[in-house]
Amino acid sequence: MHLRARAVMVAAWLACRLPEAPLLALADLAGGAWYRLATSRRRRARRNLTRVVRWLADHDMGSPEVRAAARDGRVLNHLLRDAFRHAARYYVQLVRAPIVDAKYLDRWLVIETPGVIEAALGDQRGALFVGIHMGWFELPAMVAAARTGQPALVPSETIGDPALQAYLVRTRGVLGLRLVELSSAKRLLKAALAEGGTVGLLGDRDITGGGIDTEFFGAPSPLAAGPALLAMDSGITPHVFGVWRDAAGVYHVSVEPIPFPVEGSRRERVSAYLRAEAQAFERYIAAAPEQWLAIFHPLWADLEAALAHVPVRPAPSASSAIEPAP
């Protein structure tokens, strides 16, 4: 067994047996250090977050703090540091996933749209959920598995370490999640829906390279085409969800159906669906943009091009102004 896999297993074993509060406090410290040290990651996240908060402010969306971040560099810096802390917290929760059970979900998860979720899971044709990399985004799939008694299929990138990959598959299987490799995902997901199963996808990042440019926070961004194609081929209405964490540590999940268009060419229908999906993503991200983990990754081509010509800078202080964004 590789050293990395063994280290992850030991860390997970300890994390599942220690109180959550000190672990999250440690994650906050680690996130703060990460913010200061990860120059390139911080620079990309700043550009992406700046675009998000400015768009939200222009559309009267988001909390007062989020809208203030659009014009006040100190507030933006605070929000950006929180983004690193939330990312660190997510990894802590991820290694603690084996302790998640019905009692845990009842205590730490609030379903804002229970009727919508029940209706989706009650559809005998199957259920298709599409989410974003925000909060603890695996929680809805865990809820679906607990409610239906059947595993929810979730596409996942394969890790180069076989021992670590096997560990992830095993631990997620205990939670009711069946991880499937991206190479065989299309076939397996279609088969699962045909049998009335539950499928969970994430649509805010183009991981495979086949994304379709869609207006997202005011600029074209390649969104994953998989959810749209799966909805079109299966005839099942996708249910888009968002997950965010409140100040008390409680997670909230909200779900809404996004009907797939029935008129127009195949390309027109896919494009129209993705635009409606992106608008739903924008509404969920508005609740807590600092918890949207995708800001650490390439999202918009124009911002990536700008990053290539920006010199490396040290971590900004609380009084620093917003860096310019195209």
Positions of the model-derived regions?
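Short, flexible loop segments at the rims of nucleotide/cofactor-binding pockets, characterized by
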Residues: 103-109, 174-180, 216-218, 263-264
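Active-site metal-coordination segments of metallo-dependent hydrolases
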Residues: 42-44, 158-162, 220-224
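Catalytic core of membrane glycerolipid acyltransferases/transacylases, capturing the structured
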Residues: 89, 123-183, 209-212
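A generic secondary-structure micro-motif detector
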Residues: 1, 35, 107, 130, ...
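Short Gly/charged-rich anion-binding patches and loops
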Residues: 10, 44, 115, 139, ...
